[in-house]
């Protein structure tokens, strides 16, 4: 064979071999796809059959008491994982709006308000991310809420450059934790101590005085809102659960932020999802008592309701901007008239207290408070069994019905002030704990609300939301902190007598926030102490006084006139029970999600016991809801995402150990 012919033959042979390889590959891929399709089809058929058998009784109903995240998540699990009919799911809420502590409301004219802000975490919110990966985004077609949040967060990474600021206005070097060997030893000893040995102990009972002067304590305390007298038990849980964040606590890189406030970004899409399936929302309806069947078990037989004035609560009254219609109606009421934009608010500060404009401002905030169903501390509380414009009703449960209750809410009894008015301190018995206390006396194993809700002077702190026309103040804060809005997370003034911190979120933070309006949020932990510059306790301060105290700590008081003229409103919010879930307690004070002996009853909140997990998080609410649904309905074809054991990860622990010696 000639050399040329051989080469041609070789080429032909290679082509034939290539054809065979491609054919074999194609056959393999087709076979694989077919097998995968058959596997998935069989799996879907099995799941569908399971669901049909599971929900053979279409008359069963589920009643959620409380309209917070836990109940909304529970309803979603019923629909998604139990094939439950939406019309058989009933969410009963005592307030006029759903969402619980996940709030966000206001307008450019009256000012915006968030009682609090939630810092999510990509590494530890296992069930939260899983659930919201199946909830459609309202902003992006074919995207989930999880994708929307994580995409936003990855494009707006957090890296605080001014985590702590001292009284001289200097940014503190927080590259070191500030521990001495005694601090390290006490911390290590705590990590090794069984939870059962920490009943009713406080943080300050465990650690020496030096520990509370360390950079670590200031950062850890203000990131999670601990007090020295908070539960040592919960502090240990946080150390175990958030050990992954220990080594980067000074930059807060682990903070995951939502595109908007959590009502707009979390509650609203979840609510819209549930509405699409016909879930029944009963707002402005207070549950006053539960009846149980006689005997040793725990079986709810009846739910006692007190309905308030009728509210037309449907998709039309809850706009896509996350503000209910009561506030929408306020949007034409400006805090400052357009004709007065040239006048500085600082020139109006010394007005007579009886000035009509001031009354107008207070009236606006009063309407905002009503829309959020927040009292001013003088109105008759909903916990006083007021019968005006209300009617009593009893729902009798059938044998297959279930009752799932949110036992306690940290934002109960919250009150608002405004630029000229301090919020009142409402230490009356909160609505959620009142019901919990009633039922805890009827059956064993339902926990005890007293350790959490009997000490409002210890469990309170105060937040404030500042709304500005333009970005003058935000630009000064940006120059001071070296962080653009949305990149710095928390900035704490460590020497502040109120222990004040602020957060400047990416703008806009509300869906109905115009581009020429900016907002930021802050809070103080020690509300009973006089300010460093304003000689009165934070809880007695107006929004203006809180802002001026802040300007002193920012060393911007010389820019006061320039800044104040652009302020639309500063709305302080006093929350008497906001730290109640951190109170020292016994192991038995928090009930199990599904108490022992329960046949149709579960409790879901920040006040139930979930081993290894930490309270004061969105994850805790979602995990509690999933446990309740999967247990009561015997869901076996899906698993609850376990708590990720970073405290047992050698690499994470080594990193944390190294950090503790810096």
Where are these regions (language model features)?
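Glycine-rich FAD pyrophosphate-binding loop
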Residues: 79-105
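Conserved FAD-binding subdomain of flavin-dependent enzymes
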Residues: 110-149
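Glycine-rich Rossmann-fold phosphate-binding loop(s) that bind the pyrophosphate
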Residues: 66-68
């Amino acid at each position: 064979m000639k050399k040329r012919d051989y080469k041609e033959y070789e080429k032909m042979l290679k082509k034939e071999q290539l054809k065979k390889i491609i054919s074999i590959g194609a056959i393999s891929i087709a076979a694989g796809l077919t097998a995968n399709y058959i596997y998935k089809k069989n799996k879907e058929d099995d799941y569908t059959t399971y669901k049909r058998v599971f929900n053979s009784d279409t008359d069963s109903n589920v009643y959620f008491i409380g309209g917070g995240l836990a109940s909304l998540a529970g309803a979603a699990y019923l629909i998604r994982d139990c094939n439950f009919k939406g019309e058989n799911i009933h969410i009963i809420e005592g307030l006029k709006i759903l969402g619980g502590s996940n709030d966000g409301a206001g307008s450019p004219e009256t000012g915006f308000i968030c009682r609090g802000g939630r810092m999510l975490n990509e590494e530890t919110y296992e069930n939260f991310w899983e659930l919201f990966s199946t909830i459609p985004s309202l902003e992006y077609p074919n995207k989930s809420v999880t994708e929307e949040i994580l995409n936003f967060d990855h494009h707006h990474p957090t890296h605080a450059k001014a985590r702590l600021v001292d009284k001289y206005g200097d940014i503190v070097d927080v590259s070191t934790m500030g521990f001495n060997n005694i601090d390290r030893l006490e911390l290590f000893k705590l990590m090794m101590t069984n939870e059962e040995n920490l009943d009713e102990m406080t943080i300050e009972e465990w650690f020496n005085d030096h520990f509370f002067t360390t950079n670590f304590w200031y950062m850890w305390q203000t990131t999670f809102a601990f007090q020295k007298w908070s539960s040592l038990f919960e502090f240990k849980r946080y150390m175990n659960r958030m050990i992954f964040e220990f080594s980067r606590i000074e930059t807060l890189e682990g903070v995951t932020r939502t595109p908007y406030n959590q009502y707009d970004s979390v509650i609203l899409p979840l609510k819209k999802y549930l509405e699409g399936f016909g879930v029944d929302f009963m707002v402005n309806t207070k549950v006053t008592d539960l009846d149980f069947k006689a005997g040793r078990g725990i079986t709810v037989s009846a739910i006692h309701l007190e309905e308030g004035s009728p509210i037309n609560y449907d998709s039309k009254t809850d706009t896509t901007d996350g503000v209910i219609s009561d506030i929408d109606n306020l949007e034409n009421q400006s805090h400052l008239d357009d004709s007065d934009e040239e006048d500085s608010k600082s020139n109006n500060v010394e007005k007579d207290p009886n000035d009509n404009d001031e009354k107008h401002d207070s009236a606006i905030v009063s309407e905002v408070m009503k829309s959020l169903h927040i009292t001013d501390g003088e109105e008759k509380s909903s916990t006083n069994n007021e019968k005006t414009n209300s009617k009593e009703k009893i729902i009798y449960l059938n044998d297959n019905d279930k009752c799932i209750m949110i036992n306690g809410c940290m934002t109960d009894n919250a009150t608002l002030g405004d630029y000229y008015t301090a919020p009142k301190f409402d230490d009356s018995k909160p609505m959620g704990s009142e019901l919990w206390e009633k039922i805890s006396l009827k059956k064993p194993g339902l926990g005890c609300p007293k350790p959490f809700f009997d000490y409002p002077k210890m469990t309170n702190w105060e937040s404030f939301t500042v709304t500005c026309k333009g970005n003058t103040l935000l630009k000064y804060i940006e120059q001071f902190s070296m962080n653009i809005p949305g990149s710095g997370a928390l900035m704490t003034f460590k020497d502040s007598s109120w222990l004040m911190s602020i957060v400047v979120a990416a703008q806009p933070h509300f869906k109905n926030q115009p581009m020429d309006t900016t907002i930021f949020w802050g809070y103080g932990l020690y509300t009973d102490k006089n300010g460093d510059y304003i000689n009165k306790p934070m809880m007695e301060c107006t929004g203006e006084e809180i802002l001026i105290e802040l300007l002193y700590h920012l060393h911007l008081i010389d820019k006061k006139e320039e800044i104040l003229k652009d302020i639309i409103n500063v709305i302080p919010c006093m929350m008497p029970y906001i730290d109640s879930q951190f109170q020292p307690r016994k192991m038995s004070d928090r009930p199990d999600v599904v108490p022992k002996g329960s046949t149709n009853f579960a409790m879901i909140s920040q006040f139930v016991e979930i081993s290894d997990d930490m309270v004061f998080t969105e994850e805790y609410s979602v995990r509690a809801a999933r446990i309740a649904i999967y247990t009561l309905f015997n869901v076996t074809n899906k698993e609850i995402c376990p708590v990720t054991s970073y405290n047992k990860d050698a690499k994470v622990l080594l990193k944390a150990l190294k950090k503790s010696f810096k």
